[in-house]
A protein has these predicted regions:
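Ferredoxin-type iron-sulfur electron-transfer modules in oxidoreductases and energy-metabolism complexes
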Residues: 255-282, 290-292, 298-322, 333-358, ...
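Short acidic (Asp/Glu) and glycine-rich catalytic loops that position anionic groups and cofactors
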Residues: 39-43, 219-220, 288-292, 388-392
Length: 408
């Protein structure tokens, strides 16, 4: 401890710090590769001019990414989302300060900055993250709103955040208890753990507990960072990008008149018909279900979900991107997978084609709503391996007296 002023010894009780940097390399490599995969898939889209008027776009970024105004429209969800997101921003800054002091000798962790920010503020925001996780878990597992998607991934994300924060408080509390840190009171929650631990644990036990928990905390944190680009947590990157590249034209101004007599096809019939911004939109989805909640058809009881369509398209995009990257050919198709080349424009089998039925993406079975008998069912036709023209979700009418899609 530096007697000249408030601070603490970095990596107290931790040896073999070199191992942390060895583990950091694959962590960063895995995370960067995951992010690169997303960017590579977006680059396959058609051009879209979305970088004009930077001042207006920065203003949108500040309002909706930083201030999170849209998220705050749902008061309860907005509060816990801000607790978690702002808390992680502060914790990340604090970790960066430690790294700068330890690796570059910046001596930032001194004096009032150490007391007011690195101790008190960081402790406070760490507690807000825990409170946010508790609120999110209560909403997801007790209230259970219908608009949410209930997956193991969401559970693991909340559990990982919970474990990371709890470990941080334990490491801090046991360090304060073992060293009798004179500045420990500035970390109220860590100090609470220290006061509770002193009567129960010897100094030697505190050392062992601190060391073991520190390495476990490192492993969980690095694992979470590496895993992040492969989960819906990728929205911490895609959401700000999506907001910045928003369509600034007035609502409806981008629509074009369609000549129904001369136009041969409507919309898009393959992933190649989407712009890069459309593909970014798919990856920016957080599965919150707000689009489905305000869907007029869904509001009147029709089980049509815009959210499910977005997730279907995203699964298809990711599937096609993985397959095309492997460079596999048609002969590598799974059994009964539909080849779009085996059908003509009328959907009939062509010579040399195989009469193969459409199959669903395995993930989509969980998400697809049960459509009423009169409603069309959404089926995903898997693309050809290595094909540049994968099939998109197809509205296939279910047998009924009327094949018209129910309207709200």
């Amino acid at each position: 401890m530096n007697p000249a002023g408030p601070t603490r010894q970095i990596y107290w009780n931790i040896s073999h710090i070199w191992a942390m940097y060895v583990l950091l390399l694959p962590t960063v490599a895995i995370a960067v590769y995951g992010i690169f995969r997303h960017f590579s898939s977006w680059r396959r889209g058609l051009p879209a001019a979305r970088f004009d008027r930077p001042a207006m776009r920065i203003n949108l970024l500040l309002k909706h990414a930083v201030a999170q105004r849209r998220t705050a429209r749902n008061l309860y969800a907005g509060i816990f989302h801000q607790f978690i997101s702002y808390g992680f921003v502060v914790l990340t800054i604090a970790t960066t300060v430690v790294a700068l002091d330890a690796d570059f000798g910046t001596a930032i962790m001194r004096g009032n900055f150490y007391l007011y920010f690195q101790s008190f503020t960081v402790d406070l925001f760490g507690a807000l993250v825990l409170l946010g996780v508790a609120m999110a878990a209560a909403r997801r597992y007790l209230k259970r709103p219908k608009k949410l998607v209930y997956t193991n991934e969401a559970t693991l994300i909340l559990l990982a955040i919970l474990v990371i924060c709890l470990q941080g408080f334990l490491v801090e509390g046991w360090r304060i208890a073992a060293t009798n840190d004179p500045w420990g009171a500035w970390s109220p929650f860590g100090n609470l753990i220290a006061r509770a631990s002193r009567p129960l644990m010897s100094v030697a036990t505190l050392h062992w507990a601190h060391r073991g928990t520190w390495w476990f905390h490192l492993a969980v944190s690095f694992g979470f960072i590496a895993w992040l680009p492969y989960t819906k947590m990728m929205h911490v990157i895609t959401a700000p990008l999506n907001i910045y590249t928003a369509n600034l034209a007035p609502l409806g101004a981008s629509l074009k008149n369609i000549d129904f007599e001369k136009t041969e096809s409507f919309g898009v019939n393959s992933l190649d018909g989407f712009t890069w911004k459309d593909l970014l939109d798919l990856d920016a989805c957080t599965e919150c279900g707000r689009c489905t909640a305000v869907c007029p058809a869904n509001a009147v009881g029709k089980e049509l979900s815009p959210r499910d369509i977005i997730l279907e398209l995203r699964d298809l995009k990711n599937f096609e991107f993985r397959i095309s990257n492997f460079g596999l050919r048609n002969e590598a198709l799974p059994a009964n997978a539909e080849s779009s080349a085996a059908r003509n424009a009328n959907g009939k089998n062509v010579p040399g084609g195989t009469n193969q039925s459409a199959i669903r993406n395995p993930k989509s079975e969980i998400r697809n709503p049960k459509f009423p008998s009169s409603a069309p069912s959404l089926q995903l036709r898997l693309p050809r391996f290595g094909s540049a023209q994968p099939a998109l979700p197809v509205w296939k009418p279910a047998p009924s007296s009327s094949n018209r899609c129910p309207r709200s």
